[in-house]
Amino acid sequence: MSVTKTIAVIGATGATAGGLARAILSDPEGGYTCRAITRDPESAAARALSDQGATVVRADLDDYDSLMRAFDGAYGVFCMTNYFVTFSAQQETEQAANQARAAEVAGVSHAIWSTAEDTRRWYPLDDDTMPTLPGGYKVPNWDGKGEGDRFFAATGVPTTYLLTPFHWEAFVFGLGAPQPGPDGVRTLAMPLGEAPLPGITAEDIGRCAYAIFQDPTRFVGETVGIAGDHTTGDQLAAGLSDVFGEPVRYQPIPAEIFRNLPFPGADLAANMFQFVAEDNGYDSRRDVALARSLNPSLAGFAEWVAATRGRIPVQV
């Protein structure tokens, strides 16, 4: 009789980890069960996962004891943090430490840690070519995750470090929405230069993570970078033209201008895109072919736009 292995999924009610939860639940013969970890087991998203067969467990990333209980008996754990919940890179790093320690104590066989570059390796705090943001970070929503890598390494927990790229769902929430220019033509203004921007859907991240859990011999101890496509600003604009039903042009703008635009987080977004644009290997570390080998149904940007057209706001 085969033994079913439990994968505990942090953030299972969210988009990215939810993709992993759904991948597990959609494969009842795969030999894995989903333990959905959430702060609110009574939420609609948690109840939906429960209805699909997940075991829903309450835990908080700031509460180490709750994580130990949530990970107990699990074969694998998917670990992540969300800067945009706390707006604190330091707290993200502390949450990474809590998850790594809990995984060690629980004796899990395989952890996937959803990480990012700590950009301070490329831009030290005294490097004024990229402004240092409050708290001592360059790109805080990445730096805190990258700093968290060391906790997983120190525990000795068999870990895969998953590098994900830009989430195209950001367009659904209005990030980078093309604005009419002085001549009336909608313009996608980004400090990306001519660099390609790796991107992916949240659902595809989850499917890739599930495949990684299924092949630990290949992926434990490795940093795995995935992407669904690498698109230039012009290619992003062309895809969005189909959504808007009118031309959208790409306008590269300097990061120093973008970071002073009047919207919250402009300085963070400018630093983030500057890191991509200045050829620090962000693009080359995220591999479409590898992602497709993990997930044959992987969507490219054009496919995602076609499938998501009705969800991308056209009134801006």
Label each PLM-derived region with a short phrase:
Residues 50-63:
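Rossmann-fold cofactor-recognition segment
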Residues 96, 145, 174, 269-276:
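A general structural signal for well-ordered alpha-helical segments in protein cores
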Residues 219, 255-316:
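A hydrophobic C-terminal alpha-helical subdomain
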Residues 251-253:
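NAD(P)-dinucleotide binding in Rossmann-like oxidoreductases
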Residues 2-47, 62-72, 79-93, 101-112, ...:
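Oxidoreductase cofactor-interface core, primarily capturing Rossmann-like NAD(P)-dependent enzymes
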